Amino acid sequence: MVKEKPNSTRIYDQDGFRRRAACICVRNESEKEVLLVTSSRRPDQWIVPGGGVEPEEEPSATAIREVAEEAGVIGKLGRCLGVFENHDRKHRTQVYVLIVTEELPDWEDSRNMGRQRKWFTMEEALKQLRLHKPVQLVYLESLLTATNDKATL
């Protein structure tokens, strides 16, 4: 299902959940540092970059587009961590890992709304999301679980 909004077209799945995609942006394959961006609604809060899937767009393409727009980074898309539901907002977000290869000095959301980006240690990122965006905390916890599973193989 597709709904037109003044500033975007929103795509919904068969259950009425809005389809979204996001990336946990990491500096390298060790995945010890995570890039967060300031919220467009609350600039004092740090969140995971992501947004709505557009018509005829694959979630992986959405994830890459959204991190370029919101965080001003380009990178290598890695594994999908899964699809996470937010029942309060009726969203389903497909979350990927992105290894950042380039940080743009100037990007769309920094120009248009003063959005900032910042590297956090995994521990600091967990703390920020716990405080400001608990619904996204499961994204990082999933990354940690996958990383720990990989380390024990």
Model-identified regions with their sequence ranges:
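Unchanged
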Residues: 53-139
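Entry beta-strands of beta-propeller and related beta-repeat scaffolds
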Residues: 32-34
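Acidic, metal-coordinating catalytic segment for phosphate/diphosphate chemistry
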Residues: 1-22
